Amino acid sequence: MAGIVACILLVFVTVITAQQQAVFLEYIQGRMGVLEERLSQWHDQSSRYSGELRDFKNQVLKMLENIEKERESLRNEMENTNVRVDRLEREVDYIETQNPAPPCVEIDEKLTELHDAKKKKKEKYEKITGCPAADIPGKEETDEILIPPVIRKPYCSDTISQVTAMKILKRFGSSAGLWTKDLAGNSDRIYVFDGAGNDTVYVYPRMKEFTLSSSTRKAAKIKLPFPWIGTGHIVYDGNLYYIRQDNEFQVIKFNLANKTIIDSAVLPIEQQVPVYGLSKFNYIDIVADEEGLWVIYATKENEKNICLAKLDPSSLSIEQMWDTPCPIENAESAFVVCGSLYVVYNTKLPSRSRIQCVFDVSGTISSENVPIVYFPKRYGSHSSMKYNPKEKQIYAWDDGYQMLYKLNMKHRDELY
């Protein structure tokens, strides 16, 4: 009996297992069909995406090819423009050499007054006597009014019209620095201040030695009694005027012949701030022009704009002070020409420097009637720009390169 029951159970289990297997196989087949359908869809989508990607790639390659052609065309146009500008600069230089500026001849004011007095005396005599002044005994007509012209030293009335040439002399020292001549003397010596803080000045006998020398071995070294700060120093009439590195920004007058301090002064300027937005190491910039020494500075009281002061080179006293409309922001350097402050601006990512603000102490010119003057493109940003009034050139330090800029001047009357 037990054996019969066992056989019945075995048959029943076998039947159930067969049914489950059939159901399972049917389920598996259904899932496989779904997967095959999805794989087919993915394959179609992949083919479509691959085609779109291929088309996009071809479009990008075509655009890059066109961009490269345009770039090459622009480069050729730029080269042609540079050639034309160079040719134009040479022609302008040639015209300037062929047509030198005429000498300035003026009649002395005292002689003019004497001329007027004699003329009035003559008219009065003729009115009283009724006869011409030439009939006066012992008096000749040629004694009257024939006053020869007297050549006088012309007053400074020039303004910058353009930068006509740029000369790169060499690369020396740090990215910031200063190089200059004696701006009031007749010496050919070149004075080099390497860095924005140091105590040693390098002196080369002439421009040739400075240009050809690859080191400071041929230079004489002057060790100053106090270190300097910034690049706002100047050599003027045998003396070095430099800013001492301390909290008061003391101006030191140092005689280069006997290597001694002649005088020193703390300028009457309170709460100083960097005068140039792109040259944070400069708090005071001493410059020179045809009229003497000037100080360019900035204070917290007028922290947005640059200030200007006239400096007495003998006593280091301030003669007069001005607040200018020239902003500090994006200014990299400045200089004075004929009593006018020219501020040079740039961008934080260095581009072409430009004179974009002019302040004249006499009020005869302003930024509105002076065109923007651009400097040729160069390496970085100017850490110093020193105007030489005798040469009409700017000695510039550009990211470690020593450069000369030649200026073209014109009379202020030509602006109006």
Swiss-Prot record:
Q: Please give the InterPro entries that the UniProt record associates with this protein.
A: Gal_Oxase/kelch_b-propeller, Olfac-like_dom, Olfactomedin-like_domain
Cellular component, GO annotation: extracellular region
Pfam families the record matches: OLF
Where do the coiled-coil regions begin and end? 48-129
Output the SUPFAM superfamilies linked to this UniProt entry: Galactose oxidase, central domain (SSF50965)
Where are the disulfide bridges? C156-C338
Localization in the cell: Secreted
Question: Keywords for this entry?
Answer: Coiled coil, Developmental protein, Disulfide bond, Glycoprotein, Secreted, Signal
- What superkingdom does the record give? Eukaryota
Q: Which residues are glycosylated?
A: N198, N258
- List the signal peptide residues: 1-18
Q: Which PROSITE patterns match?
A: OLF
Residue stretches making up the Olfactomedin-like domain: 155-411
Function in brief: Secreted scaffold protein that plays an essential role in dorsoventral patterning during early development. Stabilizes axial formation by restricting chordin (CHRD) activity on the dorsal side. Acts by facilitating the association between the tolloid protease BMP1 and its substrate chordin (CHRD), leading to enhance chordin (CHRD) degradation by BMP1.
**Which family does this protein fall into?**
Belongs to the OLFML3 family.
On assembly, the entry states: Interacts (via coiled coil domain) with BMP1 and (via olfactomedin-like domain) CHRD.
- The protein's name is Olfactomedin-like protein 3
Q: Tell me the gene name.
A: olfml3
